[in-house]
């Protein structure tokens, strides 16, 4: 039965996405992280790195214990209630539909010829400056975001959800939220965010690399370039400043036949990141559509293979 929970959650996300009227649990994790930061930063006697470690432990521990308590309480109430709560918690941990909606908004603006609107929409997906991007720059930023978030927002929580249920998925979401809030190499967070960044790197190590296999499978199904996926990853994945993000980004670049990376601007400061991909194909609205299709098919493959392995394992343990 456990192997059915994640597919049910995935289907629910495809149908509903993230309801705007309901406060997403990730926001609660973010508020908890902000409160923990204020608490431990206020303890002046603590070294910043230790304060950051304690913050990460409190946030991750509280999140996992809360999720476990909700699931156990629901199952004690009724087995069906336990299943429903588990599926809902898993549903809130993944975001393929939300990623598709953001990518679609950028694509539709480009198709309509509204570059300014496209810049505004892609700014909701990336942290770089978007005000001066041309059409190709907007498309590149959107594709890079879809690629990276295929791992961060879909396959990684799928991986931990399949392995450890709702608690595993939310262990990952708490880690990822901490990294997005504190994992910066600036004066404020270089020491405080050290633990959050390192733990997120650890949590993403396997999922990011397994995502490459899913992208290659999706590229085969979509008649793109599965061989290009592996060539691109071999040549460029480790060049990325992140130990993990380069894998899905290089995989997408290879499958779509484009190059990602290059010059980016953050707060008015231009930064050059390594170029990923083998061919310099044009990037436009159509490329964004291709990236979103790749994301969906790769996610379904990842989930289906994981659920199948879990089913086989459960049957072998029963026999």
Swiss-Prot record:
Keywords: Cell membrane, Cobalamin biosynthesis, Membrane, Transmembrane, Transmembrane helix
Record InterPro entries: Cobalamin_biosynth_CobD/CbiB
Name the record gives this protein: Cobalamin biosynthesis protein CobD
The protein's annotated pathway: Cofactor biosynthesis; adenosylcobalamin biosynthesis
Annotated signal peptide: none
GO BP annotations, alphabetical order: cobalamin biosynthetic process
Organism domain of life: Bacteria
GO function term, MF aspect, one: threonine-phosphate decarboxylase activity
Organism the protein comes from: Chlorobaculum tepidum (strain ATCC 49652 / DSM 12025 / NBRC 103806 / TLS) (Chlorobium tepidum)
Family annotation (PANTHER family): COBALAMIN BIOSYNTHESIS PROTEIN CBIB (PTHR34308:SF1)
């Amino acid at each position: 039965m456990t192997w059915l929970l994640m597919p049910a959650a995935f289907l629910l996300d495809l149908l509903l996405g993230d309801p705007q009227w309901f406060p997403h649990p990730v926001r609660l994790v973010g508020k908890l992280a902000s409160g923990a930061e204020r608490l431990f930063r206020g303890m002046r006697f603590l070294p910043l790195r230790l304060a950051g470690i304690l913050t990460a432990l409190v946030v991750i521990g509280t999140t996992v214990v809360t999720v476990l308590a909700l699931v156990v309480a629901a199952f004690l109430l009724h087995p069906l209630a336990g299943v429903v709560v588990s599926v809902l918690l898993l549903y809130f941990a993944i975001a393929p539909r939300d990623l598709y909606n953001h990518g679609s908004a950028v694509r539709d603006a480009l198709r309509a010829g509204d570059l300014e609107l496209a810049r505004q929409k892609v700014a909701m997906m990336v942290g770089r400056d978007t005000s001066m991007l041309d059409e190709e720059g907007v498309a590149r930023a959107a594709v890079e975001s879809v690629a990276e978030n295929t791992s961060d927002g879909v396959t990684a929580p799928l991986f931990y959800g399949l392995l450890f249920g709702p608690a595993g998925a939310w262990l990952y979401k708490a880690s990822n939220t901490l990294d997005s809030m504190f994992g910066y190499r600036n004066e404020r967070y270089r020491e405080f965010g050290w633990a959050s960044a390192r733990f997120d790197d650890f949590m993403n190590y396997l999922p990011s690399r397994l995502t490459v296999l899913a992208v290659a499978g999706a590229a085969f199904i979509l008649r793109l370039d599965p061989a290009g996926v592996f060539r691109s990853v071999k040549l460029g994945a480790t060049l990325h400043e992140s130990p993990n993000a380069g894998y899905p980004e290089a995989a997408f670049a290879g499958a779509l036949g484009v190059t990602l990376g290059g010059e980016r601007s953050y707060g008015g400061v231009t930064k050059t990141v390594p170029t990923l991909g083998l061919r310099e194909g044009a990037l436009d609205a159509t490329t964004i559509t291709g990236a979103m299709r790749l994301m969906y098919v790769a996610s379904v493959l990842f989930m289906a293979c994981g659920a199948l392995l879990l089913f086989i394992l459960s049957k072998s343990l029963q026999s």
